[in-house]
Design a protein with these regions (language model features):
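Bimodal "functional hotspot" detector
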Residues: 1-197
Length: 197
C-alpha cells in the first residue's frame, strides 16, 4: 500500500467519522425534542389576584360520589380568567398523585367564554377528554363536577357547554353526550343524588 492510498483511506475514514458524529448528534437532539413534547405540562402565569375561598365539587370514582371541598386560591378580578382559575384548581386535584378521579397530567382548560346571560362555554384540551376514564358513572361525575363547581362559584350561570380543542365533541369518553348544553338545575339534581350515595 502506497502512502498516497493510505492518505486517501485515512481522509475517507476521518470524514466518515465526522458524518457519523453529526448523525448521532442529530438523532440525540430529535429524541430529546420528542421526549419534551410527550410530557405536556400545564403552565399557569403567576396569579396577581387576591386569595379567595372557592367551592369545588370533586368526583370520587371509587365510591361513585361527589364531595364538596372548599379551597383558597388566588383569583383574578376578570370573570373569564377567574372561572378558568377555579376550574384549574379542580384539575389540579384530578391530575394529582392520589387523585380520586384520575386525569392525564396534561389535562387543561384552554379557555372559558361567557356567551350570553347564563351560558358559559368551557373549552378543554384533548388530553382532558382523551384521559377521561370511560364509563357512564365516571363521565357523569366529571361533567357534574365541572358544572356544579362553575355554578357554585358563579350563581349567574344557568347552562354550560363544553368544547374540546375549540370543537364540539359527540361524547366525553364514549358515553355522556358532550355535544349539548348542560342545564345547571338538572345537574344540581344529579349532584344531590351523587353526593348522598
Amino acid at each position: 500500500m502506497t502512502s498516497r492510498s493510505l492518505l486517501v483511506l485515512t481522509l475517507c475514514l476521518f470524514f466518515l467519522a465526522i458524518a457519523m458524529a453529526l448523525y448521532v448528534w442529530q438523532v440525540r437532539s430529535r429524541a430529546q425534542f420528542e421526549a419534551t413534547m410527550q410530557k405536556p405540562q400545564v403552565v399557569t402565569p403567576p396569579s396577581t389576584g387576591t386569595p379567595r375561598q372557592v367551592t369545588l365539587w370533586v368526583a370520587h370514582d371509587d365510591p361513585g360520589v361527589l364531595r364538596v371541598q372548599a379551597v383558597s386560591i388566588e383569583l383574578s378580578g376578570e370573570r373569564q380568567r377567574k372561572t378558568q382559575e377555579i376550574l384549574r384548581a379542580l384539575l389540579a386535584i384530578y391530575t394529582g398523585k392520589d387523585s380520586p378521579h384520575h386525569l392525564a397530567p396534561g389535562a387543561d382548560v384552554r379557555n372559558v367564554y361567557f356567551v350570553n346571560p347564563g351560558l358559559v362555554v368551557v373549552d378543554v384540551n384533548a388530553a382532558l377528554a382523551d384521559g377521561q376514564t370511560s364509563g357512564i358513572l365516571p363521565e357523569e361525575l366529571m361533567v357534574t363536577s365541572f358544572v356544579q363547581t362553575l355554578s357554585s362559584n358563579s350563581p349567574e350561570i344557568s347552562r354550560v357547554k363544553f368544547l374540546v380543542d375549540g370543537k364540539e365533541r359527540e361524547t366525553l369518553a364514549g358515553h355522556v353526550d358532550f355535544s349539548s348544553e348542560f342545564e345547571v338545575s338538572q345537574m344540581a339534581d344529579l349532584a344531590r343524588q351523587l353526593s348522598s350515595e
